[in-house]
């Protein structure tokens, strides 16, 4: 009996923050990109010397988010141009506050630099040096000033010779935008526009790119090393 009393006394004397340490506190930070990641970006042609922004201008963001089951994650990673890093951090802090569901936030490195694989996996991502879908000119993702959110719930569609192409094809069930479901971006467009991402691909006529938020091209060129 005496031992039980001592044990109870010890338990009651533990600091009140002990239980709080078991909770997942949100993580939002900006850091330089570690060498092993930049080397991987070069190896997988995610960045090369023809890109409009120098690799030293890019920052690694660590982000917390809620998934579609309401689980809390602290492992989100995204690469953004340094001049927009704080704004993007503010975006994801607000999405976290609203508990907006995000399937995952991983670097394109995890998909060997393949943007299609990233979209199919419903990955929210930002930097990758490439042309716009369909070709013709360099994508705003190449400047680190564009973000794609939940590609399955917010697909890219284009119409060519009366044939509609949906990317990723898993997003075909989300073409009807009047029926707002979890992960669709319409309820959070304001979060992006309030933080400088004035262009949303969901307002375009053809193609329509619901997942896509960006700065203007003039803003991107002004912020980058582009001449």
Language model: regions and residue ranges:
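Mid-length scaffold segments of soluble, non-membrane domains
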Residues: 102-103, 117-151
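Catalytic cores and adjacent binding grooves of peptidoglycan-active enzymes
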Residues: 132-138, 145-227
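N-terminal module-boundary/linker segments of secreted carbohydrate-active enzymes
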Residues: 20-71
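Structured segments of extracytoplasmic/periplasmic soluble domains
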Residues: 64-66, 87-101, 130, 152-155, ...
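Sec-dependent N-terminal signal peptides
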Residues: 5-13
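Active-site acidic/histidine clusters and adjacent loop/turn architecture
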Residues: 53-119
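C-terminal segment of classical bacterial N-terminal signal peptides
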Residues: 13-19
């Amino acid at each position: 009996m005496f031992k039980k009393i001592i044990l109870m006394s010890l338990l009651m004397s533990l600091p009140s923050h002990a239980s709080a340490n078991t909770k997942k506190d949100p993580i939002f930070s900006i850091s330089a990109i570690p060498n092993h990641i930049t080397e991987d970006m070069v190896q997988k042609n995610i960045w090369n010397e023809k890109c409009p922004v120098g690799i030293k201008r890019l920052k690694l963001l660590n982000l917390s988010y809620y998934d579609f089951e309401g689980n809390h994650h602290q492992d989100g990673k995204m690469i953004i141009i340094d001049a927009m890093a704080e704004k993007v951090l503010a975006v994801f802090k607000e999405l976290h506050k609203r508990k907006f569901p995000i399937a995952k936030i991983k670097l394109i490195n995890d998909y060997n630099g393949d943007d299609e694989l990233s979209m199919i996996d419903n990955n929210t991502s930002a930097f990758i040096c490439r042309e716009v879908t369909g070709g013709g000119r360099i994508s705003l993702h190449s400047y680190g000033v564009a973000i794609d959110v939940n590609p399955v719930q917010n697909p890219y569609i284009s119409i060519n010779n009366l044939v509609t192409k949906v990317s990723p094809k898993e997003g075909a069930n989300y073409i009807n935008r009047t029926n707002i479901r979890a992960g669709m971006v319409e309820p959070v467009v304001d979060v992006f526009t309030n933080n400088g991402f004035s262009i949303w691909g969901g307002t375009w006529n053809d193609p329509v790119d619901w997942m896509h938020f960006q700065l203007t091209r003039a803003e991107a060129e002004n912020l980058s090393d582009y001449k």
